[in-house]
Design a protein with these regions (language model features):
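Carbohydrate-binding surface patches
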Residues: 1-4, 9-11, 47-89, 118
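C-terminal beta-strand-rich structural cap/linker in extracellular carbohydrate-active enzymes
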Residues: 107-133
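Short beta-strands within extracellular/lumenal beta-sheet-rich domains
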Residues: 164-187
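A short beta-strand element within beta-rich, extracytoplasmic domains
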Residues: 188-203
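Short, surface-exposed beta-strand/strand-loop-strand elements in extracellular ectodomains
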Residues: 206-215
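Extracellular carbohydrate recognition and processing domains
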Residues: 215-239
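Short beta-strand-plus-loop segments that form exposed binding edges in beta-rich domains
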Residues: 245-252
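Conserved small/polar residues in nucleotide/adenosyl-binding loops
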Residues: 265-272
């Protein structure tokens, strides 16, 4: 409830609540996380086997401090290895376990932790540097035509997919102008030219319309034989937040797994190092 900024409701008999559960409910650091001024919900950035890693900004958007949950809903212990780059954190990272209310010291590169079955580890992490995001999952997108009540015929849906990065994809995208997927917080530190790579799947030729801040690119004849494939296009991002929209006004678009956006400056730096 705290990592998702959910309402705080106690659904048990307070006369018989176990001491551990009562202590958890009274944990001031978890309550502070739940009541964080930003009021954001965490999103999944890593999903391997049955484990999940969720992250969100706290205190300040695009700041150096983030909340991270290592969630293990399975029946077996889970060994987490989470690169700090995945969490958009750079340099030395100060880690605090909020459930145990214990500092774990400074770490660099990654965090490694074992989480017991049906358990979660919630951390507050403070980094030396905030990294620019690279990957944007399909399940983070806003879907204006999404319908969870089952009242629409062939509605746009999130579909489990083991070959996708987050184990989910968007299906039944397009068919009409208003049935799109939109990411409104595609962030660029300085703005400029970027290489956008879109990961998709479909079983026949499909068209995808990609709009970046209103500038549209049309990709025709995409066909992956139901495998996850990628297509790369050049895009221009402004400094700060950008809006990316995908769909197809007059036919079905391919299913979308995710997309990445990497600046040409970053690509050239890697090529120079190589």
């Amino acid at each position: 409830w705290c990592i998702m900024s959910s309402p705080l409701l106690i659904g048990c008999d307070m006369n018989t609540i176990p001491d551990f559960s009562l202590k958890l409910l009274k944990n001031k650091e978890l309550i502070a996380l739940n009541q964080d001024v930003l009021g954001l919900q965490a999103h999944v950035v890593q999903h391997e086997n049955e484990s999940y890693v969720l992250v969100k900004d706290i205190e300040q958007k695009r700041g150096l401090t983030r909340a991270v949950a290592l969630y293990n809903p399975s029946d077996q212990p889970c060994d987490f290895i989470v690169p700090f780059e995945t969490l958009e954190l750079g340099g030395n990272v100060k880690v605090r376990d909020l459930i145990k209310q214990k500092d774990l010291g400074k770490m660099k590169g990654e965090i490694r932790q074992t989480v017991q079955p049906h358990s979660v580890m919630i951390c507050k992490m403070e980094a030396e540097k905030r990294l620019e995001p690279v990957s944007y999952e399909a399940e983070w997108a806003y879907l204006p035509c999404y319908d969870d009540l089952g009242k629409k015929s062939k509605p746009i849906v999130y579909v489990p997919a083991s070959d996708c990065s987050g184990r989910m994809k968007i299906s039944r995208l397009g068919g009409r102008e208003e049935n799109f997927a939109e990411w409104s917080e595609v962030y660029s530190e300085k703005g400029g030219n970027y290489e956008m790579t879109i990961f998709y799947s479909c079983d026949k030729n499909r068209k995808l319309e990609v709009s970046v801040n209103g500038t549209k690119t049309v990709l025709k004849d995409l066909n992956s034989n139901n495998e996850v494939k990628s297509v790369t296009i050049p895009v221009s991002l402004k400094q700060g937040y950008n809006t990316v929209r995908m769909g197809n006004d007059f036919g079905w678009a391919p299913d979308i797994d995710r997309f990445t956006a990497v600046s040409y400056t970053h690509l050239r730096a890697h090529e120079t190092c190589a």
